């Protein structure tokens, strides 16, 4: 198995019940594309061409994980996020992109009053492409925080149901360990947290701990590891 940093190797070994010597901290090959300037530029241009109202805006990506046991009952409670109030609180300099988990099939209801500033991109296959045009990521318990840390965007964690979610699924680490920016627990706190968000020391430490080897060379290290194992 391969992991994205040396520090999490013991966690993976325990989780999968294998010896730590079989865990290779070499980075995540799929993140190498983040360092491909041509790919990033093309992804940005594709999104701006498809959604021209995003051009010139600061962009907040709202990308929560699903609630429920599986794909059949997956949802995100509407009471957690009011896109109209959120967009109005951020102001007209901002655009809000909503990217729901693929398990959630119900389209996001966007009021006409903010339809020029709030966009449902849940059908976009690659959330990472959206991260390339993002200024601030808002998520909760999603693994997108790791890709976002590699790219270097600011991040706000919004966890209105932390206790309930922890009881139901749990985490490998304490939730506070995943903090790569500010953490808020109520919707009323969220807009100001986004407006104040910027990459900082917390994000640097998070990146060093969890994704330090995602540096654009993970695929090369993966090939080297395979070749070494054949000797």
Regions found by a protein language model. Name each.
Residues 215-231:
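C-terminal alpha-helical cap of glycosyltransferases
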Residues 97, 102-146:
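Donor nucleotide-activated moiety binding/catalytic core segment of transferases
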Residues 23, 29-110, 184:
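Conserved catalytic-core segment of nucleotide-activated headgroup transferases in glycan assembly
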Residues 4-7, 100-102, 141, 186:
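Helix N-cap/beta->alpha junction signal
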Residues 19-20, 111-116, 143-210:
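Catalytic binding pocket for nucleotide-activated donors in carbohydrate/polymer assembly enzymes
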Residues 1, 137-138, 155:
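Short, well-ordered beta-strand core segments
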Residues 9, 20, 93-94, 115, ...:
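Short, well-ordered alpha-helix to beta-strand connector turns
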Residues 1-41:
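Active-site-proximal region of nucleotide-activated glycan assembly enzymes
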């Amino acid at each position: 198995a391969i992991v994205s940093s040396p520090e999490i190797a013991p966690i993976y070994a325990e989780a999968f019940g294998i010896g730590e010597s079989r865990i290779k901290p070499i980075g995540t090959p799929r993140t190498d594309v983040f360092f491909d300037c041509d790919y990033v530029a093309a992804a940005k241009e594709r999104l701006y061409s498809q959604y021209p109202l995003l051009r010139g805006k600061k962009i907040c990506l709202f990308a929560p994980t699903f609630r429920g046991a599986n794909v059949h009952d997956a949802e995100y409670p509407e009471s957690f996020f009011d896109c109209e109030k959120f967009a109005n609180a951020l102001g007209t300099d901002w655009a809000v992109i909503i990217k729901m988990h693929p398990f959630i099939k119900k389209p996001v209801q966007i009021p006409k009053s903010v339809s020029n500033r709030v966009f449902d991109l849940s059908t976009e296959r690659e959330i990472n492409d959206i991260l390339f045009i993002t200024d601030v990521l808002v998520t909760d318990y999603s693994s997108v925080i790791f890709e976002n840390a590699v790219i270097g965007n600011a991040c706000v964690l919004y966890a209105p149901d932390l206790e309930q979610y922890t009881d139901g699924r749990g985490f490998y680490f304490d939730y506070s360990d995943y903090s790569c920016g500010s953490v808020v627990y109520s919707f009323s706190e969220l807009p100001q947290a986004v407006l104040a968000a910027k990459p900082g020391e917390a994000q640097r430490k998070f990146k060093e701990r969890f994704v330090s080897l995602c540096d654009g060379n993970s695929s090369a290290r993966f090939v080297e590891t395979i070749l070494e194992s054949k000797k």
